[in-house]
Amino acid sequence: MSWQAYVDDHLMCDIEGHEGHRLTAAAIVGQDGSVWAQSATFPQFKPEEMNGIMTDFNEPGHLAPTGLHLGGTKYMVIQGEAGAVIRGKKGSGGITIKKTGQALVFGIYEEPVTPGKCNMVVERLGDYLLEQGL
């Protein structure tokens, strides 16, 4: 399966039990910042934004004082899983980032999608990729 198919079929799909509800943007990005696949709506990010995200995975809490920035949008960092998942909130939406062995899986959402549903979609694919050694 291509990386784009993972984004299209597993991240940007209707959320289980909620027909028509889906993430607003998603991507799979290598830990070096190279985009493997992304939705058309995924924001163009700056290298320093990706560096900040990678630093937070290696030094949990790094982004808490400044917030998580992606494509110029600032998210307030909320409880995640140290070294594995970063979660952010902005207004009625937010972001979930799951780290795998080689990549980062991004999901961005707005209401009516809930933080929990975004976490489920992103982390399920991230866990699958981890199981595959990716």
Swiss-Prot record:
Pfam (any one): Profilin
Residues carrying Phosphothreonine: 114
Superkingdom of this protein's organism: Eukaryota
Subcellular location: Cytoplasm, Cytoskeleton
Disulphides: 13-118
Alphabetized UniProt keyword annotations: Actin-binding, Allergen, Cytoplasm, Cytoskeleton, Disulfide bond, Phosphoprotein
SMART domains noted in UniProt: PROF
MF GO annotations: actin monomer binding
Keyword S-adenosyl-L-methionine: no
Mod. after translation: Phosphorylated by MAP kinases.
GO cellular component, one term: cell cortex
Alphabetical list of InterPro entries matching this protein: PFN (IPR048278), PFN_euk (IPR005455), PFN_sf (IPR036140), Profilin_CS (IPR027310)
Chain ranges for the short sequence motif Involved in PIP2 interaction as given in the UniProt record: 84-100
Note: The variability of the residues taking part of IgE-binding epitopes might be responsible of the difference in cross-reactivity among olive pollen cultivars, and between distantly related pollen species, leading to a variable range of allergy reactions among atopic patients.
UniProt-listed PANTHER family: PROFILIN (PTHR11604), PROFILIN-5 (PTHR11604:SF25)
The protein's assembly and partners: Occurs in many kinds of cells as a complex with monomeric actin in a 1:1 ratio.
Role played: Binds to actin and affects the structure of the cytoskeleton. At high concentrations, profilin prevents the polymerization of actin, whereas it enhances it at low concentrations.
Record-stated family: Belongs to the profilin family.
Listed name of the protein: Profilin-4
